[in-house]
Amino acid sequence: EITETEKIISSRSWDLIIIQEAPDMLLSKELVNELVQSDIEKIKSLNRNKNCKYMFFNTWIPKVQNYPIKSICLPKSDFDYVKFPVNNLNSDEKFCSEEILNKKEHLRILNEALNQINLKQKMTISNHPNIHFNIGNNYPEIQLYEDEYHPSKIGSFLNACIFYKMITNKNPTRLKFNAGLDEKTASLLKRIANSN
């Protein structure tokens, strides 16, 4: 079955496509190799423009985590019934994540997965998790999250500044738009986005 996203991608010749994957999909090296990589290749194959620039939106670590996070193993059949038909799978075939001891370890695992993707796909990969991690350590008063997973208005503005820099290669500190944020916070976020 063709998804709406696949229909849109194949409907025209795109110059830029930004791909995002759920962070949990990046916690298993095997899952990245067997599913994420092939999903990216499928997206690329649907686009008519062979000179398209592809970016991978490397999302941030969730805000609230109780560490350690135990290794989670899920049957391969839960992920893709076309790629892993249930009747062809041994019931023991699973994707397993690593145990995550702390937030720094979580960041390391995400970055390793993205390096794995980049080695094969040669995509521009955003630096969101490292930027969020550093802001959390250096500016704990800045609330980047609305809830455990989603960005607040401040976090969304930071994300927009990061993408502005990635897509245009222009300095976001020159933008006058502040999204209704106070000047001090907006200026700091623009500087951080520009320096990464």
Residue ranges and their predicted role:
Residues 3-149, 153, 174:
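Alpha-helical cap/lid subdomain in secreted, periplasmic
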Residues 142-196:
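Conserved catalytic region of serine esterases and O-acyltransferases that act on ester linkages
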